[in-house]
Amino acid sequence: MFRYLLCSFGLVLMYPTGIDMYLVGLPQIASQLGASEAQLHIAFSVYLAGMATTMLFAGSLADRIGRKPITLFGALLFALASYFAAGSQTSDLFLIARFAQGIGAGCCYVVAFAILRDVLDDKRRAKVLSMVNGVTCIIPVIAPVIGHLIMLKFPWPSLFYTMAAMGLLVFALCLLVLRETHSKAAFHTQALPGVQRESFKQGFFISRLVITTLGVTTILSYVNVSPMLIMGQMGFDRGQYSNTMAMMALVSMLASFSTPFLLNRFKEKSLILFSQGLFVAAALVFILTQLGGVSHSFNLLGFAFVCSGFSIGFGVTMSQALSPFVARAGVASSLLGIAQVCTSALYIWVMGLLEVSAINILLLILSVGALVSITLMLAVPKMSEMVVNEQIPESA
């Protein structure tokens, strides 16, 4: 079991590392490539675009040819793309390399969830996904620090050489340690009458897809508007802003690592509803600060509610979303990832076009997201027949 957890953690961590590690070198990258920092900020969107475009075919291929080949392809592509990004001489070549990096990270991210679906039952999967979420929260704090330390001695290409080394390490892990988890799944699914109901149109899957998508949109909206709220509205400087974000990452980690213990005492439904209640509490805090009822410093409490609400609910809801699928777990994971990435990007883009204020962007998704999610949780309970599909392949 340890081999699957180790490889899955490595596969998942490539995605946030590709986002956060290079940011510290952005001014130097822009200077050497003859582009403005604003122009190179599109590298973030290009990376996510690479992830989104590859997610569907990666999941489908993983269901057809197995998990391991896709992980090897994704990790190797991530390493090669990182190497070429380090050697880029123009901004166009740099953006192409970033897109390829996103493709590699997307393959690994999708298959990691499919592997966990293959080898873990419902209860253990919910716990592990919560821990994965907790580890992921560490990267936005650690990656820029590591990047800063690297750049004290070496130029900016060393950041991408480091990412290339990480890709090769994950490739070696998957090649030497990971065993195929999907090879015998087809044999089992033929004997399961529930497989005929592995439809992505079923209400249960759609409801959990919507809930996880709204959750990801909420947390990314918080990350997107946090500079305006913390440095603009609250008057913090950059150092205080960094400390605040690090503190909120710590809150997320503690909430994520506490969730497995909470699952021993409470039902999954109760935890998901509690997480939505934290979103509602965050919205109320922000409303009070905007009305002048309390100091803007209380926004920090709202941020803590947002981070802990997402951390407690996301892993559990993702586990439920994957539960009905044995033969099509890869595609299910792909659909979840695509919905989360695309909806988040679309929401933030539309709010920007409409010139909605930072606090209202966050308030809107908190309020609407919590209302919709609570309604879906109460209206679409966990299916009893899902127990049939909760078997795992013998190869795991």
UniProtKB/Swiss-Prot annotation:
InterPro entries: MFS, MFS_dom, MFS_Efflux_Transporters, MFS_trans_sf, Multidrug-R_MdtL
PROSITE patterns named in the record: MFS
GO CC list: plasma membrane
GO MF: transmembrane transporter activity
Superkingdom of the organism of origin: Bacteria
Annotated transmembrane regions: 5-25, 42-62, 69-89, 93-113, 132-152, 158-178, 210-230, 243-263, 271-291, 298-318, 334-354, 361-381
GO annotation terms (biological process): xenobiotic detoxification by transmembrane export across the plasma membrane
Membrane topology: Multi-pass membrane protein
Cellular compartments annotated: Cell inner membrane
Protein family membership: Belongs to the major facilitator superfamily. DHA1 family. MdtL (TC 2.A.1.2.22) subfamily.
HAMAP family reported in the protein's UniProt record: MFS_MdtL (MF_01530)
Name of the featured protein: Multidrug resistance protein MdtL
Gene symbol of the encoding locus: mdtL
